[in-house]
Amino acid sequence: MAAHHRQNTAGRRKVQVSYVIRDEVEKYNRNGVNALQLDPALNRLFTAGRDSIIRIWNVNQHKQDPYIASMEHHTDWVNDIVLCCNGKTLISASSDTTVKVWNAHKGFCMSTLRTHKDYVKALAYAKDKELVASAGLDRQIFLWDVNTLTALTASNNTVTTSSLSGNKDSIYSLAMNQMGTVIVSGSTEKVLRVWDPRTCQKLMKLKGHTDNVKALLLNRDGTQCLSGSSDGTIRLWSLGQQRCIATYRVHDEGVWALQVNEGFTHVYSGGRDRKIYCTDLRNPDIRLLICEEKAPVLKMELDRSADPPLALWVATTKSSVNKWPIKGILNFRSSGDYENDCSTPLSPICSQPDQVIKGGASIIQCNILNDKRHILTKDTNNNVAYWDVLKACKVEDLGKVDFEEEIKKRFKMVYVPNWFSVDLKTGMLTITLDESDCFAAWVSAKDAGFSSPDGSDPKLNLGGLLLQALLEFWPRTHINPMEEEENEVNHVANGEQENRIQKGNGYFQVPPHTPVIFGEAGGRTLFRLLCRDSGGETESMLLNETVPQWVIDITVDKNMPKFNKIPFYLQPHSSSGAKTLKKDRLSASDMLQVRKVMEHVYEKIINVDTESQTTSSSNNEKPGEQEKEEDIAVLAEEKIELLCQDQILDPNMDLRTVKHFIWKSGGDLTLHYRQKST
């Protein structure tokens, strides 16, 4: 079946905006490593991270700092990578539903394939044919000609792909032989499905495993297949006989990763039990425990620069990657240094790795403070940090302190509505803004720590300010479209226009390296760019296609959202002896301070005798009016108490805080007033 791939646009889909708070250069894997590829010719190791980043390392042991570069374009876990074209091209598969094609030598993304509709979990590569297959949770397998992929350009951006149908469940593993004549998939269906990729014909279905098939390998001519499963077994299959010919029960738990030597005689296996074994396929009882990792094994890569291999690179759910020496271990069959009594625990032959690609810490816990601006996090090294969501930066490293105590220490009796969500999936803070609540949080400039040029204390919308900062470099946001023509007429001639352009929000900027992601609510990424790059011609064009209207409204059209209103009732307190008023439902901004309600009570209810003196028109302010207002404010605080649930309210508190922390009930907020006893 032929299918065509083109760049998607936002259309009518619900689009969210996300951004990642991080350093400009993230040198270390910040989470588990899902995949490895080794280029022995250049001494380079590629690691595919759960932090969404592919990194390139120099594995020459004499190098003090092995980091070379990062390949960044994915927005979710990178689940698999394959090196093609003698190491020139890298293909990657991600949970962001895309397959990407990279220049492996220069480290940039050449094209993005959006054919999959769900997480892409596995890739397979036929070296002799330069053919790659991709598969994932959408149950689809697509075949890609690598030479066609590397020839894609901005104008020539359509590629035809073949697909293999028939899978009934999510695919987690894939293998293709070097000659490109056989492809095998493993899935939660617990069976192996086999196709001929040349004709896309299904050849057979192999049953035997009792759980998800997580790892697959084929020999060169495609006659034998090895599978590793969450059921804890490794199976060897004869495709000619269409059956399992051997079962290896080496591990205590699920088998997630396999490697095999060139002769297809010895299998290296790892998984949930953290142990890595080498097993002789010709004699299932002959096995050797190479090492024990500190975390479950996700992927292994043999150093094939020599035969037999000299080393095994191992990636786990931790962020460091280890190189274990295996030189000479294939001779263990004749040396007698192995255990063939499976009931006797084996001792690992390696206690320390030869080389470690050190990883960084991953954020594993977070707490959004009740100012709804700052976040406390705890990482895998038990370090606590303090972050500013609005400015997209880390404020302070607090070290190994008590996380819960820090939360208590920073508690304020203030309520701000939720306006963003946090995701820790990549091990870094990813903040997502959604149209449904992005504009829910208003604060005063003073409370936010911002000063206004005219000395006033305007109300600021946190979500609106942030969107303006994230798109500050996008030219379309610089001039209000209503004023654009007038500005050009008035200022171009004298060169003043550039100076007149207002960028951003006028209060703060976010770090220019901040990644900004536009994606569907379901998780599919539409466009990723760095904040500073939105001024580029290509980026501007893609933003025009992708940015949803709710973001355009605030960043381009400068239409601020409306204030949130809160309904409430105002009644005399039972202790005041005053007659209960007619129950009128009042409404005010949820940021209205209690003192303003006290002033209303003093002016309109208690002090009725002077009412005529305090209702002057706001359009015709008279001398002394400001003083009169200040007098009323002072008198109101001296004479009036406002209560909620019989608790006296702080005049500085706002209505939303009263409702959240004190009212705590369904229905409309009810406030009671009384005169202070003298």
Swiss-Prot record:
Lineage: superkingdom: Eukaryota
Cell location: Nucleus; Cytoplasm; Lysosome; Late endosome
UniProt-annotated stretches for the region Disordered: 608-629
Annotated organism of origin: Xenopus tropicalis
General function of this protein: Regulator of deubiquitinating complexes, which acts as a strong activator of usp1, usp12 and usp46. Enhances the usp1-mediated deubiquitination of fancd2; usp1 being almost inactive by itself. Activates deubiquitination by increasing the catalytic turnover without increasing the affinity of deubiquitinating enzymes for the substrate. Also activates deubiquitinating activity of complexes containing usp12. Together with rad51ap1, promotes DNA repair by stimulating rad51-mediated homologous recombination. Binds single-stranded DNA (ssDNA) and double-stranded DNA (dsDNA).
Protein name per UniProt: WD repeat-containing protein 48
InterPro entries to which the protein is assigned, alphabetical: G-protein_beta_WD-40_rep, WD40/YVTN_repeat-like_dom_sf, WD40_repeat_CS, WD40_repeat_dom_sf, WD40_rpt, WDR48, WDR48/Bun107
GO BP terms in the entry: DNA damage response; DNA repair; positive regulation of double-strand break repair via homologous recombination
CDD domains per the UniProt record, alphabetical: Ubl_WDR48, WD40
